A protein has these predicted regions:
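Conserved beta-strand hairpin/beta-sheet module of binuclear metal-dependent hydrolase folds
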Residues: 1-49, 55, 98
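Conserved beta-strand segments of alpha/beta enzyme cores
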Residues: 1-3, 82, 142, 156-158
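Conserved beta-strand positions that form and line the central face of beta-propeller blades
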Residues: 4, 28, 143, 149, ...
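Active-site HxH/HxHxD metal-binding segment of metal-dependent hydrolases
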Residues: 14, 37, 47-152
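Core dinuclear metal-dependent hydrolase active-site scaffold
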Residues: 20, 147-168
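Divalent metal-coordination and catalytic microenvironments
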Residues: 21, 30, 42, 63, ...
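Glycine-centered loop/turn positions within well-structured domains
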Residues: 27, 67, 91, 157, ...
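Short, glycine/acidic-enriched loop or turn micro-motifs at the edges of active sites
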Residues: 33-35, 66, 164, 168
């Protein structure tokens, strides 16, 4: 059974969808940002299905946006779960602040190159920097390769690397 656990974010997009895969190993797909309200909602969602964070055995990260990966380190520490992500995301997650800073610099440079006024580009970068502490370094125990497989007792998922929404 795959269960939807909606987790609130402070972003205009609203909730992020996290998924609990009730199989062996017990797996959570995406985490929400590292905020108290997000963690509380995730814990409540797990409890609705008779689970708690400490029961998690695997965490799968779909891409590096903070609303999808922010709680990964906290959940991995509390549960001891294996963390899986597409291979290009592994070094990014293991150097959180360095990576997110580089993304912000790239975004600001891109805006400036395309004619966005400096004060607006700087304002966007400042806003983005305010989110940096909503995630932190986490070791990716299992980098996933495009076309590879993620095994469960009752199913196998094919890994598909489809960048576009994010670089990873």
């Amino acid at each position: 059974m795959i269960r939807l656990i909606p987790v609130p974010t402070p972003f205009a997009v609203g909730e992020v969808n996290c998924y609990l895969v009730e199989d062996d190993p017990l797996t959570l797909v995406d985490t929400g940002p590292d905020l108290g309200t997000s963690l509380a909602a995730l814990e409540a969602g797990l409890a609705e299905h008779g689970r708690k964070v400490e029961d998690l055995e695997r965490i799968v990260l779909t891409h590096q946006h903070i609303d999808h990966v922010g709680l990964a380190a906290t959940l991995a520490e509390r549960s001891g779960a294996e963390v899986c992500a597409i291979a290009p995301l592994a070094p990014w997650m293991e150097r959180w602040h360095e990576s997110i800073d580089a993304d912000d610099r790239f975004g600001e440079e891109l805006m400036l190159r395309h004619g966005v006024p400096e004060e607006q580009a700087a304002a966007v970068r400042k806003l983005s920097a305010s989110f940096h502490d909503w995630g932190r370094n986490v070791r990716v125990d299992r980098p996933l390769e495009d076309g590879g497989a993620l095994e469960f007792a009752g199913r196998t998922w094919k890994v598909l690397h489809r960048p576009g929404h994010s670089p990873s």
